[in-house]
């Protein structure tokens, strides 16, 4: 399979990703917060998940904290790991879940840690897939 075909496949898998992220502060004010995905669908974000995030994020950071929380799945030497590149997202996960494995400024999670986060943030987090073409 050539790189162009593989890139198109990954893009198709990630079509659920948001067209544009929204701030925690903005979404907390809404009765029924939603995010529009690249595929055109509107996805409802559960209010209780936003409130859970707000409990672990400094209120001054709410306008800068973007929803959804992006969990980037990568394959490293045959092992799948999750990267959290956004610094505010990483700090939130550290406070809320106790995961603190930061390498080169990126929070790194193992697959067995993902379900704990996804159970609590079913609608407010999104897993994206990345592949290294090296």
UniProtKB/Swiss-Prot annotation:
Coiled coil: none annotated. Transmembrane segments: none annotated. Pfam families: DUF61 (PF01886). InterPro entries: UPF0216. This is UPF0216 protein AF_0460. Belongs to the UPF0216 family.
